[in-house]
Every structure is written in structure tokens, then in C-alpha cells.
From Swiss-Prot:
Keywords: Ribonucleoprotein, Ribosomal protein
Subunit comment: Part of the 50S ribosomal subunit.
Protein name: Large ribosomal subunit protein uL30
Pfam families reported in the protein's UniProt record: Ribosomal_L30
Amino acid sequence: MAYAVVRVRGSVGVRGNIADTMKMLRLHRVNHCVVIPDNEHYTGMIKKVKDYVTYGEIDKDTLVALILKRGRLPGNKRLTEELVKELTELPVEELAEKIIAGEIKIKDTPIKPVFRLHPPRKGYDRAGVKKGFSIGGALGYRSGKINDLLNKMM
């Protein structure tokens, strides 16, 4: 299983240890997304920054769309299915399955590990970016609903 983590809030007024954790997760700007494996190290980092990000389990279809639409190579070159197959020796769907299963990390491929997304179309549909998802906001854990948000942001 892999998590998609999207930074929702900015950097003004963020405590130093949380800002450092955001840097370690490569979430330098708002609407940046990373896909990370499910292990105790990353889980602890996510719990620390939960008041500034939203996260959940990403599915295969969303990850394939994310790689093809928003994935980039060094030099800001766009990705195509043929280019992904040439660079990783795997089709995009199989690459997505292996990333979700934890067999491959995105940082082990030539794909840039950060996906730069648009703000969500029609907004977050919630009470704002200062409240948790469980009480009507946009922050924190949102399980499979992260896929709907990512589709709105691609």
C-alpha cells in the first residue's frame, strides 16, 4: 500500500520541526504531492505534519493518471507511456502496481518524486483548509477519498 500526500497549507508560521519534516517529505510548496510507501518511518512523518497536509491510500488508476499527466523527468520533460516503458522497462500500469505494493519507490526511477498539481477544481468542497477532514475540513487522513481529490487537481 502507498500513500499520496498533498500539501494543503502554506509555510508562514510553521514550527521549525514541522518545516523540516515537510522538507524531508519533499513538500516544499502548496499543492505538491508525493507518493510514499506505507512504513513506520513515513507514517510517523505524516502524523507530525497532519495539520498541514491531506493524505490517503492511492489506487492504481489514479497513480497511472498522475504519472502520465503530472509526472516529469529532469529538465521538466513530460512523460508518455512509451518513455516510461523505455526508462523503467515496465509498462505504466505495472509500474503503478509495483509502487503501490512497495516493490519499487518512485525515487528509484528517473521520474521526479514530486508531482506539481493544480488547486482542486470547485475547491475542497469542505469548510476550509484549517479544519480536519473528519470535522468537515480538508486536512488529515481521508482514506480512499484522496483519489477524488487528486483527480480534481490533475
